Amino acid sequence: MAWYDGAIFYHILPGAVSPDGEKKSAFLCMEEQLPYLKVLGIDAVILGPLFSEDPLCYGARDFTGINPRLGTEEEFCHYVERAHSMGVKVILDVAVLFSSRSFFAFQDLLQHKEKSAYRSWYKDVQFTVEGEKEDGFTYAAWKDLADYPLFNFDDEDLRMYIVERIKDWISRFDIDGLRLAHCSCMDIHFQKS
């Protein structure tokens, strides 16, 4: 039987953790809550997206660094170590179905238009129609929200980029698993990779 069969999970949105006016990071505040979660019988925490800087915390600007308003990478690593020392697994909730408009690949698309090396990373990019944001093109967006352009998982380079980021998170942060946000909308072959 796998460790997650019958496990009790607790979902935390780090961006919503309130340090009660103190100058503590979200990770330090969450670390203080670990003993309480252990008493509740929690086996694993699922941490909402850490890599985003948008208000909903799902449209990533950068898939490599932790959002600085949550705390430092060191503080996050310490949180994971402390959780593990208490027998609590750490799962990252990751949103890789789309990016924010400030993500480097979309910024390149805005700047270079048809000549962008990242044009194929996004779904349904069309330069014949003006979009909602008046960029000179349209694109598919998550729930038709133009701030969240959908990735095109048919693109091999994009898939490799995302898989490499995920491998990096697992090795760098010693996390125990992933929850792929919006995976029902995602290519099944990518999910399996």
Give the ranges of each region predicted by the language model.
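Active-site and adjacent substrate-binding regions of carbohydrate-active enzymes
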Residues: 1-193
